[in-house]
């Protein structure tokens, strides 16, 4: 099973690897609490020392929809 991590914009740390849904939910909450409107999530790839993100996706808060939407 793949692990996922991510970060909110203007942050200098990644969240710990976890399931996609758990990472997504945590990043939504973290972004709101940090007054951010953008976060990134991706698949964790071990680099031997730490990890990198692969297939990174950006989500942006959409005021009109009242939801986080994937941004291309």
Name every feature range the model reports, one short phrase each.
Residues 11-17, 52:
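Surface-exposed loop/edge segments in extracytoplasmic proteins
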Residues 33-72:
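Short, mixed-charge low-complexity intrinsically disordered segments
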Residues 18-40:
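A short, charged, amphipathic alpha-helix used as a generic interaction element across diverse proteins
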Residues 11, 20, 44-47:
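Generic structural motif
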Residues 1, 18-24, 58, 64-67:
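A short, sequence-level motif marking secondary-structure junctions
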Residues 1-12:
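Short aromatic-glycine-(Arg/Gly/Cys) micro-motifs in beta-strand/loop hairpins
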């Amino acid at each position: 099973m793949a692990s996922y991590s991510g970060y909110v914009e203007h942050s200098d740390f990644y969240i710990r690897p976890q399931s996609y849904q758990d990472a997504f939910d945590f990043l939504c909450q973290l972004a709101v609490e940090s007054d951010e409107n953008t976060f990134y999530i991706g698949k964790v790839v071990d680099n031997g020392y730490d990890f990198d993100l692969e297939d990174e996706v950006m989500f942006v808060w959409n005021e009109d929809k009242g939801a986080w939407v994937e941004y291309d």
